């Protein structure tokens, strides 16, 4: 992703999944929440400071896998982010508390469909298209590694359609649809 043409380290941010330190290790256990895209993010120091050399990728990978940042530090207690002001994170909080009595933020995993975006914005169609294939493969790998019981996408069909088709081998099963007021949710068994 960091080698996509037109990417400027001072103008783009890269997302890596967040996994709580108490995320279940058993197969088919835990919850993986998926958002649309980065929309601004704090990056490991090597993203902005490393020289543009072959070693950049390894420095970034080392920062990601040696990070001790959890959802609690990254989202809930971030000095420049209002967790309580985010309907997105309040919904994740409420759903997680249905499964876990306390400390939900240490027991879930979070990722995005698209991993690369301009700071403070979601990727435009061009940037989405440049990264779509690799992001679909990354999402499948995240699901494989984390082996969650539930994968909950807060994305809408427009954003998730190609990803769902990819994860389902090119043919979507009929979803279970639930409506409440003007809202609806769709559940797929994949």
Question: Where do the PLM segments sit?
Answer:
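A polyanion-binding, active-site-adjacent surface
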Residues: 1-146, 150, 156-160
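Charged, glycine-enriched surface loops/patches
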Residues: 82-99, 163-190
């Amino acid at each position: 992703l960091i080698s996509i043409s037109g990417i400027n380290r001072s103008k783009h941010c890269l997302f890596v999944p967040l996994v709580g330190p108490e995320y279940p290790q058993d197969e088919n256990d835990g919850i993986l929440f998926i958002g649309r895209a980065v929309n601004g993010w704090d990056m490991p120091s090597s993203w902005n400071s490393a020289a543009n050399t072959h070693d950049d990728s390894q420095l970034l990978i080392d920062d990601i896998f040696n990070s001790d940042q959890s959802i609690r530090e990254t989202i809930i207690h971030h000095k420049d982010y209002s967790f309580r002001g985010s309907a997105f994170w309040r919904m994740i909080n409420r759903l997680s508390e249905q499964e876990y009595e306390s400390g939900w933020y240490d027991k879930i995993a979070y990722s995005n469909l698209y991993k690369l975006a301009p700071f403070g914005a979601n990727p435009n169609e061009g940037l989405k298209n440049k990264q779509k294939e690799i992001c679909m493969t990354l999402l499948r790998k995240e699901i494989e590694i984390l082996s969650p019981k539930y994968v909950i996408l807060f994305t809408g069909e427009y954003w998730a359609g190609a990803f769902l088709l990819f994860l389902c081998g090119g043919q979507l099963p009929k979803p279970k649809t639930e409506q409440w007021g003007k809202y609806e949710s769709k559940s797929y068994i994949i």
